[in-house]
């Protein structure tokens, strides 16, 4: 590798990975509830293991949803439809342990500190306080058209295409569980120049050979996802490097909601506040705050105000306004952090109810985000991925 070059690696997983099964079940339940009761409070956690799904958490709503049916339908859609996979939508046990939201938390969310103290005029927006304290990050970079880091973008692309090859029976020996990983080489100007390593581990029928899997992935997977200009004779491929991946899914490993937070975001390329997304209604700033931070970051880059930017927002439980906003452009902007923050404060309402209104989050849009990443999804119409404020932001800041 040339001097001053460096490598960066990100991974993704398929929708059949145990942790992603759990995420998708949690978000499918959230969508079912929020479609009937947009103001519901949902914190839904799922764990999956051999032959068993446990759904637990705090849900406050006046509507009924058939949780066992949602669980089974989600598992079936993912592709676990045979008992020999060790996990089957029809025969797995489904247990539920659901409580209402704590009244101590509800008090602060129902009526924010600013509203309770009479310190705010904007009652409708100030009425909702943050559902918890915490810090969230949003990130954008001009490495890709989607304004995502290239390693995670390619890792997601491989995982999504692998799932498509399985579900369309193009490669009918594939089974639902899979992981992908891409290592990108960057030059001295921090621009991606080549792919150094690709790792794919995919569950498969026991009778297929590893040689056949490798041949098929080189024919049907890699050319469909990765630009050939990034590949060379030194690119390394590791396909099922253990030599066998027959036992997978919840039979191989237990899964839990919220254990793939780096896969869900930027593949480790940007910092993470630690809060997971799936199963949480939009009053939970772990989710809505991270979406808003991505929205801000993406519009900053789309406006040409920076080539790369990380936005941090932080909240106190029961308080509507963020306690802090931080913007780091890594030296790629001609404008100061304060100039950018002033423009963001002018255009983006980062109070919980403001985010919910700005991004129209009280809708059943979450199940589709629970696999293959929440950001950079050109295959979905996600409100936080829009760059509709870029021009207005540019006019505010560029004098």
Swiss-Prot record:
Q: Does the keyword Translocase apply?
A: no
Q: What remark does the entry make about the cofactor? A: Binds 2 divalent ions per subunit. Binds 1 potassium ion per subunit.
**UniProt-annotated binding residues for Mg(2+):** 19
Quick one: which residues bind L-methionine?
58, 101, 253, 284
Q: Which cofactor does it need?
A: Mg(2+); K(+)
- Specify where the region named Flexible loop lies, as residue ranges: 101-111
Recorded metabolic or biological pathway in which this protein acts:
Amino-acid biosynthesis; S-adenosyl-L-methionine biosynthesis; S-adenosyl-L-methionine from L-methionine: step 1/1
Q: Domain of life, per the record?
A: Bacteria
Gene3D superfamilies per the UniProt record, alphabetical: 3.30.300.10
Q: Where on this chain does ATP bind?
A: 17, 177-179, 244-245, 253, 259-260, 276, 280
Tell me its EC number(s), please: 2.5.1.6
Biological process annotations from GO: one-carbon metabolic process; S-adenosylmethionine biosynthetic process
Q: Where in the cell is it found?
A: Cytoplasm
Q: How does it assemble?
A: Homotetramer; dimer of dimers.
* Family affiliation: Belongs to the AdoMet synthase family.
Q: What is the protein named?
A: S-adenosylmethionine synthase
Q: Which gene encodes it?
A: metK
């Amino acid at each position: 590798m040339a001097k001053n070059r460096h490598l960066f690696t990100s991974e993704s997983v398929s929708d059949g990975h145990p942790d992603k099964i759990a995420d998708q079940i949690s978000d499918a339940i959230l969508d079912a509830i929020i479609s009937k009761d947009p103001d519901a409070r949902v914190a839904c956690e799922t764990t999956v293991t051999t032959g068993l799904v446990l759904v637990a958490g705090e849900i406050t709503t006046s509507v009924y949803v058939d949780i066992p049916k949602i669980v089974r339908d989600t598992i079936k859609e993912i592709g676990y439809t045979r008992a020999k996979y060790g996990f089957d939508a029809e025969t797995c046990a489904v247990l539920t342990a659901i409580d209402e939201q704590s009244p101590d938390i509800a008090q602060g969310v129902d009526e924010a500190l600013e509203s309770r103290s009479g310190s705010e005029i904007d009652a409708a927006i100030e009425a909702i306080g943050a559902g918890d304290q915490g810090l969230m990050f949003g990130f954008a970079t001009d490495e890709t058209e989607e304004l995502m880091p290239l390693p995670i973008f390619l890792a997601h692309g491989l995982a999504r295409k692998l799932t498509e090859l399985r579900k369309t029976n193009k490669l009918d020996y594939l089974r639902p569980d899979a992981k992908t990983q891409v290592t990108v080489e960057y030059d001295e100007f921090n621009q991606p120049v080549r792919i150094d390593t690709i790792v794919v581990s995919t569950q498969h029928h026991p009778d297929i050979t590893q040689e056949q899997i490798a041949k098929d992935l080189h024919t049907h997977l890699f050319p469909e996802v990765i630009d050939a200009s990034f590949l060379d004779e030194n690119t390394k491929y590791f396909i099922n490097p253990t030599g066998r991946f027959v036992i997978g899914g919840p039979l191989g490993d237990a899964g839990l909601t919220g254990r793939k937070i780096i896969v869900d975001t930027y593949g480790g390329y940007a910092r993470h506040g630690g809060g997971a997304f799936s199963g949480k209604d939009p009053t939970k700033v772990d989710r809505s705050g991270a979406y808003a931070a991505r929205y801000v970051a993406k519009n900053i880059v789309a406006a040409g105000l920076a080539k790369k930017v990380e936005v941090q927002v932080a909240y106190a439980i029961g308080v509507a306004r963020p306690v802090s906003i931080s913007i780091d452009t890594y030296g790629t902007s001609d404008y100061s952090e304060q100039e950018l923050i002033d423009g963001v404060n002018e255009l983006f309402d980062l109070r919980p109810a403001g985010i919910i209104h700005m991004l129209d989050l009280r809708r059943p849009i979450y199940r589709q985000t629970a696999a293959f990443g929440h950001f950079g999804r050109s295959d979905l119409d996600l409100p936080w991925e829009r760059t509709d404020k870029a021009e207005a932001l540019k006019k505010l800041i560029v004098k």
